[in-house]
Amino acid sequence: IIGIWDQTIPATEDRKPPEGFVEGTLYTEEDINAALAINNMSERMRLVPSTDLSGHGTHVAGIAAGTGILSDGRYKGVAPKCDILVVKLGNPISKSFPKTSQLMTGVDFAVKTALARNQPLAINVSFGNNYGSHDGNAIIETYLNTAANYWKTNIIVGTGNEGGSRTHTAGILTPNV
């Protein structure tokens, strides 16, 4: 893991956001490795208190980059030798979605980081919502298309888990019926 930008942890005098950004806290590869070297969990969490409360981010990271170490190499991710840059999108309030602007700043940070490291980039956007028109013209759709054309960037967006639940519907409303 080359870094974690946790937008849910407010910046302090000791904990800063990434350069050029105003919210959250950036934990560097050095911070993460120093925390992992500590056996005491509370001390480790003092250094890097970012956690995946739902397990979803960990699950998605395993699919992308799992090494198979816990399964004797049987279950590996798509790219087990890749570097991981975590952006925990922002809203410290339970059961709420991050703002579109937080996703956009996360993508911007990832692209800038990949460019600075001269590395290709795959961004996995795996959080669900049903915002917008879904016709390719919403601000987030336009932004992601533009970002995907910059540098060596692929952006993968989950299509949802709703199946046939009719989250979106179409029809004609008839007055007084």
Residue ranges and their predicted role:
Residues 1-101, 118-119, 152, 167:
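Subtilisin-like serine protease catalytic core
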Residues 91-177:
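Substrate-binding/access-modulating region of protease and related hydrolase catalytic domains
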